[in-house]
């Protein structure tokens, strides 16, 4: 079985295939978080606001307590894309990062901070400081505007997964991805003879576990536990793929082996999520947990891009 990361430059999509199965699908912006040497072309002194030219014919809005003159060069980062008739928003307090550290130009006295769950890495710490100084020194050069650093999510993803091959493809014509996208449209999804129903609501996500057509000669309690156990990885795989977070309630088949089931859940959830909290079973027999949100669900993203 093959594992690799992929990119579709046309759809600005990227993600990972693990053992010939879609693990995640994301989308990136070609401008958001890029760092530029921009040129001040206008200003409003009363509100410390500046209008910057950051690319050919492209302007952005910057608010800064630091004073600039028209014609000055400013090192800044796009933090909000242009939308309808509104200009993009830039910040002089740029953020740079690698897989271990992140750094803001002005916060924390300009020193890198270790990312949650990462181990100290002297080489990556120094690399970030060197990059910061290099970017700041760019204010002294010409011409402006100039793109200095692309810093979209795809770049960071490639850095994080540098041990995997990067494959360029068309997500619409790749069978693994297109089949997964079709699945995401459905609430009821199957794993062999078993199934789950995913209802992703505004306030929570409710998942119903079904044995469907599966038959067994096992004791009923053992059979229900086995069905629940067999679906644990399938449930968290689909929550991760669909990028569903927040409160999650799972209606497992009723079994007396809930403690064993919680142990299995703890083993499996770590493969897909870093930040979560397990509350356990309620008096009504429903299993509750919360997962840290990571932006819009994949279903909403696909709908916005008219891919479903």
Predicted regions and their residues:
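Extended, charged alpha/beta regions that create polyanion-binding interfaces
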Residues: 1-34, 79-203
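Short nucleic-acid-contacting surface segments enriched for D/E, G, S/T with interspersed K/R
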Residues: 33-35, 65-75
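Conserved glycine-centered short motifs in functionally critical loops
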Residues: 50, 82-84, 94-104, 192-308
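SH3/SH3-like beta-barrel fold
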Residues: 50-54, 76, 88
């Amino acid at each position: 079985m093959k594992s690799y990361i992929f990119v579709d430059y046309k759809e600005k999509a990227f993600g990972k295939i693990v053992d010939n199965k879609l693990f995640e699908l994301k989308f990136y912006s070609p401008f958001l978080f890029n760092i530029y040497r921009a040129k001040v072309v206008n200003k409003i002194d009363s509100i410390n606001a500046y209008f910057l030219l950051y690319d050919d014919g492209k302007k952005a809005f910057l608010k800064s307590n630091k004073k600039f003159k028209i014609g000055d060069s400013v090192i800044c980062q796009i933090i909000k894309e242009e939308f309808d008739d509104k200009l993009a928003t830039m910040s002089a307090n740029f953020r740079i990062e690698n897989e271990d550290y992140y750094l803001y130009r002005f916060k924390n006295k300009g020193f890198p901070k270790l990312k949650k769950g990462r181990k100290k890495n002297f080489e990556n710490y120094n690399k970030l400081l060197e990059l910061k100084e290099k970017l700041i020194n760019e204010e002294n050069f010409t011409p402006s505007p100039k793109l200095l650093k692309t810093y979209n999510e795809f770049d960071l993803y490639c850095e994080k997964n540098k041990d995997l091959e990067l494959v360029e493809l068309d997500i619409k014509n790749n069978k693994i991805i297109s089949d997964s996208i079709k699945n995401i449209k459905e609430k009821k999804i199957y794993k062999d003879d078993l199934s789950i129903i995913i209802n992703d609501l505004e306030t929570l996500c409710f998942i119903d576990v079904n044995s469907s057509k599966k038959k067994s000669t096992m004791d009923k309690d053992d059979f229900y536990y086995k069905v629940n156990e067999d679906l644990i990885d399938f449930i968290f795989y689909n929550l991760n793929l669909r990028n569903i977070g927040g409160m999650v309630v799972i209606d497992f088949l009723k079994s007396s082996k809930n403690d064993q089931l919680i142990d299995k859940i703890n083993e499996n959830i770590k493969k897909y999520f870093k930040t979560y909290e397990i509350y356990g079973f309620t008096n009504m027999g429903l299993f509750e947990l919360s997962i840290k949100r990571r932006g819009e669900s994949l279903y909403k993203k696909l709908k916005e891009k008219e891919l479903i």
